[in-house]
Amino acid sequence: MTSHPVFIDLSLDEQVQELRKYFKKLGAEISSEKSNKGVEDDLHKIIGVCEVCFKDGEPAQIDGILNSIVSIMITIPLDRGENIVLAYCEKMTKAPNQPLAKVCLQSLWRLFNNLDTASPLRYHVYYHLVQVAKQCDQVLEVFTGVDQLKSQFANCPPSSEQMQKLYRLLHDVTKDTNLELSSKVMIELLGTYTADNACVAREDAMKCIVTALADPNTFLLDPLLSLKPVRFLEGDLIHDLLSIFVSDKLPSYVQFYEDHKEFVNSQGLNHEQNMKKMRLLTFMQLAESYPEMTFDTLTKELQINEDEVEPFVIEVLKTKLVRARLDQANRKVHISSTMHRTFGAPQWEQLRDLLQAWKENLSSVREGLTNVSSAQLDLARSQKLIH
């Protein structure tokens, strides 16, 4: 979302006077005269009634009024501006409809970008900005990822508690429209806890697991097990379910669902979606061990009919998690490569051995090229001597 700098031609006193007159004309309980306590008191009074412009005003007109308020607000010194900014942010969350919510969003974004990047008030503005963005379906305009979020606060990082609160909000506003982004937010949230306070993050850990399991694009779930808050859930059903998605095959999930159907449903997880994901994860695990699989093996392991094998493999190939070739004539699937479901010590050792083999092969090629080059030079010298 882009925002233009705030610039108003009138003086502060003139702006305050005009705003007071405008809101009084709309029927607000406010004096048209300036306060003798100064511009900060004027702002408190104006912000206190500013929502009256939502009733009948046009969006463009309201945007101009809010822009005028913001232009005054950013002149207030930081040590005296917190209550004013918070009051204004709260008012912006009260827009009665989506078009006006977009106007309020633009106003908050304008305020956010005109505050000093080292101002701690930017956190509070951004928090309310996300709330308003949800009201008008504009969340991705103000939040595109964790890296972008951190860069916004690089000059004045919020406290761990503030970031936890913000991450929870971001998870809430993205979980219905972008599960992948929501899952990343929750993982980032759990990363803010330490060994000392991880035990109090039970609810956050459960939400993180459920979001990751529900996300159709998240398949590498092993990293969740290393998060401290998730470790505190060991022995709970949600942790058992996560462990199945991390390293077990489809039959383990089917048995778990039969034993704990009510629990799975209570978490908001869709059984059919879980089955689809577990089939894909099971296929990946089989592909790690078998470079070639028959259709009969797949129908048994994946609990599908034979006529479903080809469509299933095609869907797997679309994910790019596995590279394979269908052999319809011989009813087989030939595996070229697959992403590992878990990446622990064995996988690191395998990668080390592969890199070592490459190194040795490159050394052999280099040595061979050197020998060929030397032989050609010797031949060239001998031919010169002959002539």
Swiss-Prot record:
Major localisation: cytoplasm
Q: Which GO terms describe its cellular component?
A: eukaryotic 43S preinitiation complex; eukaryotic 48S preinitiation complex; eukaryotic translation initiation factor 3 complex, eIF3m; Golgi apparatus
Subcellular localization(s) per the UniProt record? Cytoplasm; Golgi apparatus
Which GO molecular function entries does the Swiss-Prot or TrEMBL record give?
translation initiation factor activity
Record's keyword terms, sorted: Cytoplasm, Golgi apparatus, Initiation factor, Protein biosynthesis
Q: Which biological processes are named by the entry's GO terms? A: formation of cytoplasmic translation initiation complex
Pfam families under this entry? eIF3m_C_helix, PCI
Q: Where is the PCI domain?
A: 181-340
Q: Which segment of the chain is annotated as a signal peptide?
A: none
**What InterPro entries does the record point to?**
ARM-type_fold, COPS7/eIF3m, eIF3m, eIF3m_C_helix, PCI_dom, WH_DNA-bd_sf
Enumerate the PANTHER family for this protein: COP9 SIGNALOSOME COMPLEX SUBUNIT 7/DENDRITIC CELL PROTEIN GA17, EUKARYOTIC TRANSLATION INITIATION FACTOR 3 SUBUNIT M
Family to which the UniProt record says this protein belongs = Belongs to the eIF-3 subunit M family.
What does it do? Answer: Component of the eukaryotic translation initiation factor 3 (eIF-3) complex, which is involved in protein synthesis of a specialized repertoire of mRNAs and, together with other initiation factors, stimulates binding of mRNA and methionyl-tRNAi to the 40S ribosome. The eIF-3 complex specifically targets and initiates translation of a subset of mRNAs involved in cell proliferation.
What quaternary structure, including any partners, is listed in this protein's UniProt entry? Component of the eukaryotic translation initiation factor 3 (eIF-3) complex. The eIF-3 complex interacts with pix.
Designated name of the protein: Eukaryotic translation initiation factor 3 subunit M
Identify the gene encoding this protein: Tango7
